Amino acid sequence: TEFGIRINTELSIAGGTRYVKADYQFQQYWPLSKRYTFAVNTEFGYGKGLGGKSFPLLKNYFGGGLGSVRGFEQGTLGGVSPSSIAPTDRAQDIRVGGNRSLLLNSELIAPFPGVGNDRTLRMFAFVDVGNVYCTASTTVNCASNALRASSGFGISWLSPVGPLRLAYTTPIKKEVTDRTQKIQFQIGTAF
């Protein structure tokens, strides 16, 4: 069994931007046999403006996509600001994320068929649950607070430049305004 915990805190009290931001991440891998592994990733994030200041938009959390809730377009979960160019066209909304996030990923990892003992090419099945939350304002419409969920399968290759992942996804809990993707590709991280 391998596990890791990451805790990060930011505090800004100087200048015109005053805020606190805290992140927590926990990952654990359980070998089920020599060939199969079950993995879990949990993340929580919280940000708040201090001294009457708003939480900075550039520090917002963004959810959706590989590395988050797969099956949703990258960075589309959370608050939206209606486009000033086409205010009635929901497809033109600007995604602004939110100051709170929740994410749970679970994966069953297995060797790719026909590769023998090569552990660099693997396949996985997954279920993801999560969302990004915001505080509504006159310029930001916070999307539904309901958790989003997806499932799917994919392949990963531990290449010389880092992990490459390709996933086929199906959102299983979504809202009408959510932007979804069936196929997603990622370079970089395990989840």
Summary of predicted features, one role per range:
Residues 170-174:
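A short, acidic, flexible beta-alpha connecting loop/helix-capping segment that sits on the rim
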